[in-house]
Regions:
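A carboxyl-terminal module marker
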Residues: 1-92
Length: 92
């Protein structure tokens, strides 16, 4: 069955490793999350000296059926909620 992708960009404190963010994404992504790829790390003084932006590509897929957009969107919502709670991220 076809996969669907979502990209998320997160503004986060420089002290938080990208690996820790990815661990949360994997733990909160649900059964349909099949891959996570960090594709950009951006630092700029406009973000603040203690901030960076991390961009991830998330792939969702079911082995039993085609996912609808709402299912993938709900997974992303759960991920963002947990990242905000745990790391005080801001979605970009």
């Amino acid at each position: 069955f076809p996969a669907t992708s979502r990209d998320i960009a997160l503004q986060i404190n420089n002290n938080i490793p990208a690996e820790k963010v990815q661990e949360v994404i994997l733990s909160k992504g649900g059964d349909f999350l099949c891959s996570v790829n960090l594709f950009d790390i951006y630092r700029d003084e406009k973000l603040g000296n203690d901030q960076k932006s991390l961009a991830y590509s998330l792939k969702f897929q079911s082995s039993e059926r085609t996912l609808v957009d709402d299912e993938a969107d709900e997974c992303v919502k759960n991920i963002i909620t947990e990242l905000k709670s745990k790391f005080n991220i801001m979605q970009r």
